[in-house]
Amino acid sequence: MSSRKGLYFLRPFIFSPLTKKETAYARFFSAARSISRREVIRVTARSRHPHNAAVKAQPKIENDYDAAVAELSHSAANEGRIQKLKEYNALRYPRVSRHGNRMSIPKFRHTFENVTTSAPASEEVLLQGRIMSIRASGYKLVFMDISGDFEKVQVMISLNNVPVDNPEEFKRTLHPLLRGDIVSVTGTAMRTSSGELSLKATTLPSLLSPCVAPLPKKLINEETRILKRHVDLLVNRETADVLRLRSYIIKYLRDFFHERDFTEVQTPLLADYAGGAAARPFLTSATEFPNKELALRIAPELWLKRLVVGGMNKVFEIGPAFRNEGLDATHNPEFTICEFYSAYSNLQELMAMTETLIRGLLEHTKLLKESKLPTLDIAELAEPSEDNWRQVEFVPALEDALGIKLPNLSDPDAHEQLINLLEGKSRLPPVELEGASLNRLLDHLASTHLEGDSLTAPLFITHHPACMAPLAKSFACPRTGQLVSARAELFVAGREIANMYEEENDPFEQRRKFELQVLSRRGSGEEGDGGEEGQARVDESYVRALEHGLPPTGGWGCGVDRLVMLLSGTPRIADVLSFGSLRNVVSLSQVAKK
């Protein structure tokens, strides 16, 4: 049996023909491997083989890893730093070894908080972190501050306390260390004469990852802070605190719902139709469905309500959504949304639950500022008290603000009537809203004349016209006679925080509302590619799901990014996203190509 046949017998898959996808993956994997140091050395050795004439013709490269280092030093303008590390044989990136008493810096500070100047600890521990400052006191004593897990500790390295053969070894180990380097050091806890908890090194520090690019003391330029977010996080504590607050808020939301017996679920991001909100979707395609246009979800609402139909009476989801719309201080095309649906809940219960949630989050944020997130700026947020949560009804409040009596907003020509009334009062909407649907026009009027009242206290705007909430139950308002929805929006400090309503569970009424929505979009010329209000069609699949019976259900949605903005006191949505807005992310890619 030949060796090849033997291999086939043992490993038949080696000789199986590859598909196109597998071939492409193999090429990618081969290319990725080729940049490793081991592969470079192997290829270099082959290039020297006398029988490899094809490779022999290639320019001779002694070590491609060195070439990569040379390219880095040129592009980063830090050749001197790299040469110094080479000189001290410190340009290394070693693997970490297991240590029985490795501690995080926060745990070290907590464990040894009672150590005194006269009674240092005897237990040896290993700390790892990034050098934020380093200073020498003569040639026998060096101090450094290392940070990790958002806390710092001082390390004292004395020639008299570490095992070295001679002072030159002490110098050669410490001399190449700079701010930004990542090190590990073993020692015992002590407190200095000034009362500072420190680690007294019993071994010389080991360099785990040198910082070959200079680490600034501070970043101020906003564009640079976003484009170099990793540096911003290292030098600006407030940036990290905002992102950490985001994590705490999401955890608080999850705990809040779990404590109330909600089930967390995940619903599709990609489907053949994006419904659940009035927004233009991102459209794409998939190789499995070459002739079908797909869309990224704009909201998880319709999926979640299908689960309620299926008997999951309390569900919630926290996840991404995508809307192909404008980008400004409070909007980003990619954002995080939280929605919950609770069977047998009405609008008043949803509003009460919202108030409880926001109050709890405010208190939680204050405690975090006092304990873990000291740089948060939440002082300007007016604290809601028991009696200052206001409620206004949409139609009466807007009529008072405009000084007009709104037409019957259910009439087919309501849009034209409203435009004529606004023209008579010299309150025509801006040019960009010409041709907008009645829904968008009413939304603009509310944002201009009603939402500002939330600057001094939280404001619920309730009972929007039915045309503004086609997925909500509707009823005739006894006060105005208008057909309105069982809906409320919460605004705090001028920002929309949450949207909630009693869900339409009548399949026949839901179909009628979908059809009216389609007609409205066609009338305003916004149907085509989705316009500003998204795709318009009757979602037959959802209507059929309702035919199996959706119990009376309350639904609620909140933009997590805006919630973090509110609680952190940040003015821009980019500040609460790990790498800024979509504009920042795209700019980052463009800068990398230059």
Each model region followed by its residue ranges:
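Class II aminoacyl-tRNA synthetase catalytic cores and aaRS-like
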Residues: 2-594
